[in-house]
Amino acid sequence: GLKVSCSVSAHHLTLIDDELDFFDSKVKVTPPLRTKSDTKALLKGLKDGVIDVITSDHNPIDIEHKKLEFSLAKDGTIGLESLFGTVNSVLDIETTIKALTINPRAIFGQESITIEKDTVANLTLFNPEGISVFSKENILSTSKNSAFTGKELKGKVYGIFANKKLVLN
């Protein structure tokens, strides 16, 4: 049979159209945000295994193209830095990890990662129960257009080790 995979962005899992100020261009994304029942269906699809992967849909837009009248502003929001906390706020940790790491590797035919003696491990240190507020001051991306600015997220990242170096602390 034909191999098919399905993904959804973190902001489509967590943001609901009628709860937001739609004249705020930070939430202008493509496809547009939908209803609470749509979001519930997406979450069910993840839990049931119909949806395989959650993406950041990281689409940085410079301030000149976001600080326009809503209809003229470009679509897009950054999503990489808020991804874990956003998703972990609405899903259990097992589903979160599977959709962010295990399933994407499987889809692309990559082996599962294991931690073994005498091998280099790339790790993210996090507390799945930790709470943090996603603030504009802490955004590392050049673009600051996040739909999650000021929101409380569940899951605090303390650091990332890659190729024997601490790359985020």
Predicted features and spans:
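Active-site core of metal-dependent hydrolases
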Residues: G1-I54, H58-K74
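His/Asp/Glu-enriched, well-ordered alpha-helical/loop segment
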Residues: K26, K47-D48, V53-I54, N59-F126
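A generic local structural motif
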Residues: D38-L42, E111-S112, S146
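Electropositive phosphate-/nucleotide-binding environments in soluble metabolic enzymes
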Residues: F23, P32-K40, K74-E81, E94, ...
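Flexible, active-site-adjacent loop/turn segments at secondary-structure boundaries
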Residues: H11-L13, D18, V27, P31, ...
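Low-complexity, flexible helical/coil segments
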Residues: I16-D24, D38-K47, N88-E94, L153-K165
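C-terminal cap of metal-dependent C-N hydrolases
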Residues: L72, V120-N169
